[in-house]
Structure formats: structure tokens, C-alpha cells
């Protein structure tokens, strides 16, 4: 586990609730040894390291889970790939398209597994939606819509320009991945966007229109200063399907007013930092399945689609005039 932050804490809590014969957390690394040791004590992890390099050298580590801040993803991914490890990296995989391309090229050249942790795609409610679409239950598709907004202006990371904060990379990626998923991972023909910037220079609230081949389109809004409906929907000539709030970790799917529930495993006495934390188990099990099959990437979140999502988000940022220090000008 690379990082001793909040999301890493949730992931470890989930892994330890799964069978030990299938998942074992062998070590954690942070850039501050004290934090790593404290995290290891809290979660009962045998080894703690004060640098990522030491963790990369640990022969007991088969898979590295990277839960650092956005701008640290690339260096960490490249470090663990160079050490011959499989890598599951939190979204967004990179701050921009160039970073993502570099990581994907490295994984492919080394023949190692790399996956962007878009956990939403591993949820049973999303599987059910994909099945419906595959069966043509909604008829010919016409439009998809997604919204994700929370007031995160008190969360330092969310408004920090140097850390590539803002809504698009943190929340917008969930919206884009939904629209991309329902339209089969195609490249949009046209992207337009409007938005406002926060006083620190990150994007605050953004609305995006995506025109796809075949006359279908999608739109999404993401915001770090206002609460939105946090739902996703797709409509066709025979009806509408909606993932209810929280659509980034959904447990309810409504198809033409018929509601289906996909409850999570009970949390019992576990403490999570984020909503529906138990849902990270779907992602963990998916990575295990991929590795057992000898796959180098996930069929659910293929690397080509991670590249496409990064391309779209970068184009949106250009349209609204948001650049980060990690962007090459």
C-alpha cells in the first residue's frame, strides 16, 4: 500500500475483511516513516517503510496499490513497474494525457499489469446496467447525463492548484467514465465546455457536452463548491436507466421506474473515511481475478480507455483555461 492517507485506509480495511487466502496486506509506505508506522499499527500491517523505494524492493509485494495525491501517481507507478510489480493506481491515473501515455507505455513494454482504480465499474449495479444495454433494453441510445458535486472547498487538496485539485480530475472523471462506458468507449467527435474557476486557479464548477459518433451525446456537470444530484442516467428509444446517488459507488439502479437494489456487504464495526467503503472489495476481487488469469490490463477499465478519459479531461481543461504545473506548455 503506497500512501498512508484516507483512501488507502479504506482500501486496507476492505482487504482485511476479505479471505486471507486471497488478499494480504504485507506492507505500507509513506514519505514519513512515523506516519507509515502509525498506519501499520492501526491496521495491523506487518511492515512499514519511510520511502516508496524501500517498498518497491520488498520481494513479498506482488501488487502495489497507489493512493497518493494526483501529481505523485506517475512517479509511483513508474517506480513499481520498474520493480516488476503489478499496479492498481487510484484515479485519475495521471494529471494529464502525457502522464497517462507514459505509464501505459511502460506497463506494456514491461508486460506488467496496470489498472486505473475506477471502482465504480466493478459495482454489481453497474454490471446490471451494462447487461441491460447489451441486451438493447433501452432501445437505440440517445443521451447520457451525469452529475457529481459536493462542497469540498474546505478540503485543502481539492482547492490546491499545485496538487492538481478541482472538480474535473477528482469528480468529473466519474462522470466521463460513465458516459464513455454507456457509449462503448468511443472517442467523442466534439467536446465543448463552460465553467468557472476557483480563486486558487483550479476548476470549480464545469459543464461539458460530448458529441459521439452515431448521433448520440452526453453531458455532465461536476463541482467542488456545490452539491449536485450525484446521479447518472442513460436514455434510449425504449426508456431510461438511472444510477441513483451516490452514482460513483452505486447500490441502486432504476430502469423505467423499476428500482433494483444491490446492497453492499455489511460494514459491521468497520470505520470508513468515504461513503460505501465496502464497495472497494469489488475492485480488489477484480484485480485478483485479472492477475489469476494472467491479464496485463483490466477488460472493465482497459488502458486505452484510461488514455481516452485523460484526453477528454485535458481537452475540457483547455476549453475552460485551467492548466496545472504538471502540464507541459
UniProtKB/Swiss-Prot annotation:
GO terms (BP aspect): D-xylose catabolic process
Control of this protein's activity: Stimulated by various salts.
Marked site positions, May play an important role for the adaptation of the alcohol substrate into the binding site: 170
Catalytic activity, EC: 1.3.1.20, 1.1.1.179
Protein family membership: Belongs to the Gfo/Idh/MocA family.
Subunit structure: Homodimer.
Protein name in the entry: Trans-1,2-dihydrobenzene-1,2-diol dehydrogenase
Organism of origin: Oryctolagus cuniculus
Lineage: Eukaryota, Metazoa, Chordata, Craniata, Vertebrata
Amino acid at each position: 500500500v503506497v500512501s498512508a492517507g484516507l483512501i488507502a485506509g479504506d482500501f486496507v480495511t476492505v482487504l482485511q475483511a476479505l479471505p486471507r487466502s486471497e488478499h494480504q496486506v504485507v506492507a505500507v509506505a509513506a514519505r514519513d516513516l512515523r506516519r507509515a508506522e502509525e498506519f501499520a499499527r492501526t491496521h495491523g500491517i506487518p511492515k512499514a517503510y519511510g520511502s516508496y523505494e524501500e517498498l518497491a524492493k520488498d520481494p513479498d509485494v506482488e501488487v502495489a496499490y497507489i493512493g497518493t495525491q494526483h501529481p505523485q501517481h506517475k512517479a509511483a507507478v513508474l517506480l513499481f513497474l520498474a520493480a516488476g510489480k503489478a499496479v492498481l493506481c487510484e484515479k485519475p491515473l495521471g494529471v494529464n494525457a502525457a502522464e497517462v501515455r507514459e505509464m501505459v507505455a511502460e506497463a506494456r513494454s514491461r508486460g506488467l499489469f496496470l489498472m486505473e482504480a475506477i471502482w465504480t465499474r466493478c459495482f454489481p449495479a453497474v454490471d446490471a446496467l451494462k447487461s441491460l444495454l447489451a441486451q438493447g433494453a433501452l432501445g437505440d441510445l440517445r443521451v447520457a447525463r451525469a452529475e457529481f458535486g459536493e462542497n469540498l472547498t474546505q478540503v485543502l487538496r481539492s482547492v490546491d492548484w499545485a496538487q492538481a485539485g478541482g472538480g474535473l480530475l477528482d469528480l468529473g472523471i466519474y462522470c466521463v467514465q460513465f458516459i464513455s462506458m454507456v457509449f462503448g468507449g468511443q472517442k467523442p467527435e466534439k467536446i465543448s465546455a463552460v465553467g468557472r474557476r476557483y480563486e486558487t486557479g483550479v476548476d470549480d464548477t464545469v459543464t461539458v457536452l460530448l458529441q459521439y459518433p452515431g448521433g448520440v451525446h452526453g453531458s455532465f456537470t461536476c463541482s467542488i463548491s456545490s452539491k449536485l444530484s450525484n446521479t447518472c442516467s442513460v436514455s434510449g428509444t425504449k426508456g431510461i436507466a438511472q444510477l441513483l446517488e451516490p452514482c460513483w459507488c452505486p447500490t441502486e439502479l432504476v430502469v423505467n421506474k423499476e428500482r433494483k437494489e444491490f446492497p453492499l456487504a455489511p460494514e459491521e464495526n468497520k470505520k470508513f473515511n468515504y461513503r460505501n467503503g465496502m464497495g472497494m472489495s469489488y475492485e480488489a476481487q477484480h484485480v485478483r481475478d485479472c492477475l489469476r488469469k494472467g491479464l496485463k490490463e483490466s477488460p472493465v477499465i482497459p488502458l486505452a480507455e484510461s488514455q481516452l478519459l485523460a484526453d477528454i479531461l485535458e481537452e475540457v481543461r483547455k476549453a475552460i483555461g485551467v492548466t496545472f504545473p504538471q502540464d507541459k506548455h
